[in-house]
A protein has these predicted regions:
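N-terminal, polar/charged subdomain of small-to-medium soluble alpha/beta proteins
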Residues: 1-90, 99-138
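Short hydrophobic/aromatic beta-strand micro-patches
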Residues: 95-97
Length: 138
């Protein structure tokens, strides 16, 4: 099973964890990204995340399908937030359940690393004294 979502609404860790649990799985890996208070010495006020939704959903599905097949995992959850986020907010949750922990770890790392490289999500960091677009991806 795969659950993919891009939303302007706050992401819910508890709901994500409840969904990812599978009675047949001994390993669950959960990655939660948070907005940092500082980047390269600049105090972050907020982030603005934007995307081309359908293209991003398609790419996330491709990533999830690959991970599911390569590591034989049971469940994959990829939730990404868009819009304005404050320091401490959660822009991304990735969770993987598998029969064994190594498969869950490996699949989760692959998903977040590939998401950051290939999914069309744009991030603007707003600082106290300026702003900058950070790459083409989060």
């Amino acid at each position: 099973m795969i659950d993919i979502k891009i939303t302007p609404k706050e992401l819910n860790i508890r709901e994500s964890l409840d969904w990812i649990v599978d009675a047949q799985c001994g390993g669950i890996d959960l990655f939660i990204g948070r907005v940092r208070p500082e980047t390269l010495g600049n105090k972050v006020v907020q982030l603005e995340l934007d995307t081309y939704t359908q293209m991003a959903l398609n790419e996330l599905q491709t990533i999830a399908n690959y991970a599911k097949n390569k590591w034989n995992v049971q469940r994959i959850l990829i939730h990404h937030r868009i819009g304005v986020l404050r320091v401490g907010d959660i822009p991304v949750i990735i969770a993987v359940s598998a029969e064994h922990r190594n498969a869950a770890f490996d699949a989760c790392r692959y998903i977040i690393d590939t998401l950051k490289q290939t999914v069309p999500i744009w991030k603007k960091e707003i600082y106290e004294d300026g702003e900058v677009w950070v790459g083409a991806n989060p």
